[in-house]
C-alpha cells in the first residue's frame, strides 16, 4: 500500500504537466441521476481547477430526460444512439438539462468554493447547429429514413465566451442545447458537443465520464486500455461498439483527429476515477490517441 506522501509525489509531475492546460470533461450516465456520484465528480473537477487546470464541464442528462418523459407518459425512441426529439420532447429536454441539471451542478461547484457559470449551447451562440438530416435505419430488413425531429448537427462552435470565463477563473458548465440560424433550439448529443467544444478550445484532453469502464471488446469482457484512432475506427466499423457508445467513441476519435492530444472514456460511477486517470501512472479507462 502506497504511503500518502507517495501518492502526492506521484501526482506532482502530472500537476506540473497539466497546469494551465484546458481539459473538457463530459459528465453523463448515472452521475446525472445519482446525487452522490455527481457530487463526487464535481469535487474532483474543482480540485483540478484549484491545481491550475482550465476545466470545462459539458453535461448530458439522458437518463433523467427518459425518466421525466416516462413520468409524463411519453416513450423515448432512439436511432443510432440519438434521441428522436419532437417539440414536446425538446421542451422536456430543455427543462431537465437547463432548468435542473445545469443549475444543480453550479450549486455543487459553489459548495466546493469555486465559481461556475451555467450555460446552454445557445447562450452567446456557443453552439450553432442545423437540423440533422434524415437517418437511415434498418427495420426488419427494410431500410427506412427516420426524421429525428429537433436534433441538431453542429455547424460551428464559438469558444470566445468560454475562453473569457476561463481567463477569469470560472468553470463553464454547458448543457447540450444549440441554436440554429433562425433562433430555434435544437437538441445536441452531449458527447458530440463535448468533443467539438474540446476541438474549438484546443483542449489538451477530452474526458468522457460514463457508466462503463471504457471501450470494451465485442464480448464485453475486456476493456482496452489504449487505442490508436485507427484501432478505434476499426472497432466502430466492426460493429463491436454498442449503439449507446457510438456517439462517445466517435466524438473522442474526432477530437484526437482535430488536435486534442488525448481522449479518455472512464467510468464516472467509481469514486475519484477522474483523479486516478489524470494523476497516476496507471490511469483508468480507455485512452485514445493518434498512435
From Swiss-Prot:
Q: In which pathway does it act?
A: Amino-acid biosynthesis; L-arginine biosynthesis; N(2)-acetyl-L-ornithine from L-glutamate: step 2/4
What the entry lists under InterPro entries is as follows:
AceGlu_kinase-like_sf (IPR036393), AcgluKinase_fam (IPR004662), ArgB (IPR037528), Asp/Glu/Uridylate_kinase (IPR001048), Glu/AcGlu_kinase (IPR001057), NAGK-C (IPR041727)
Mind telling me which Gene3D superfamilies this protein's record contains?
Acetylglutamate kinase-like (3.40.1160.10)
Query: What NCBIfam families does this protein map onto?
Result: argB
| This protein's name | Acetylglutamate kinase
Q: Cytoplasm: present as a keyword of the record? A: yes
- Describe the task this protein carries out: Catalyzes the ATP-dependent phosphorylation of N-acetyl-L-glutamate.
Member of which family?
Answer: Belongs to the acetylglutamate kinase family. ArgB subfamily.
Which UniProt keyword terms apply here?
A: Amino-acid biosynthesis, Arginine biosynthesis, ATP-binding, Cytoplasm, Kinase, Nucleotide-binding, Transferase
Matching CDD domains, A to Z? Answer: AAK_NAGK-C
The lineage is: Archaea, Methanobacteriati, Methanobacteriota, Stenosarchaea group, Methanomicrobia
Which species?
Methanoregula boonei (strain DSM 21154 / JCM 14090 / 6A8)
- Is Amino-acid biosynthesis there in the keyword field? yes
Q: Which GO terms describe its cellular component?
A: cytoplasm
Superkingdom is: Archaea
Please tell me which top-level EC class this enzyme sits in: transferase
GO terms for biological process? Answer: arginine biosynthetic process via ornithine; L-arginine biosynthetic process
* The protein's Enzyme Commission number: 2.7.2.8
Task: List the residue(s) that the UniProt entry marks as the site Transition state stabilizer.
Answer: 26, 248
Q: List the subcellular locations.
A: Cytoplasm
The protein's GO terms of the molecular function aspect are:
acetylglutamate kinase activity; ATP binding
Q: Where does substrate bind?
A: 61-62, 83, 187
* Reaction it catalyzes: N-acetyl-L-glutamate + ATP = N-acetyl-L-glutamyl 5-phosphate + ADP
